Design a protein with these regions (language model features):
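Interfacial loop/beta elements and low-complexity acidic/Ser/Thr-rich segments
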Residues: 1-164
Length: 164
């Protein structure tokens, strides 16, 4: 998508799908992703996109979905003091030089209005870290809304892992 443009709204023609397959596979599915080719969208339009079924699903009641997209000017919104969550900590404790970071979200104004600080997840993966050693770790940021871009103002933190 062009730098000054962003998706304002995105509406599916169908919000439900019936899947057929083994019950054990069906029990593991809560949603179906449809890939939207954002880079090719430069104006308001409706696209028909195929639905790719997960492995183990034999068929579904629909094979494609129409997505209506409206485009607007890109805006940004900064969220202050988003907490950092440590993952793969196990039975250890972690201390770091900072506990929160600022995150700037880029997208359409309407999309940005729907995002709260609680929707943003910043993580530091502690897997494989040695204990009692200060280590620089890259932070990762994500959010539920995948039609916006999340950017960290701080990309690394220093962490020390110790036994509880």
């Amino acid at each position: 998508m062009e730098n000054d443009l962003a998706i304002e709204t995105c509406t599916l023609s169908q919000d439900k799908i019936t899947l057929y397959g083994k019950q054990s596979v069906l029990d593991q599915i809560s949603s179906i992703d449809v890939s939207l080719p954002v880079s090719s969208i430069t104006s308001d339009r409706t696209l028909k996109l195929p639905i790719t079924l997960p492995s183990g699903i034999t068929t579904s009641d629909i094979s494609e979905v129409s997505i209506s997209v409206t485009v607007g000017k890109q805006s940004k919104k900064t969220f202050k003091d988003v907490p950092i969550k440590f993952v793969n900590l196990g039975d250890r404790e972690a201390s770091s030089d900072i506990s929160t970071v600022d995150v700037t979200v880029y997208g359409g104004e309407e999309m940005l209005q729907k995002i709260d600080k609680e929707d943003i997840i910043v993580t530091a993966d502690l897997k494989g870290l040695s204990e009692n050693k200060k280590t620089s770790l890259a932070l990762k940021v994500s959010g539920e809304n995948r039609l916006v871009d999340y950017k960290l103002d701080t990309s690394e933190i220093s962490v020390t892992v110790t036994k509880k």
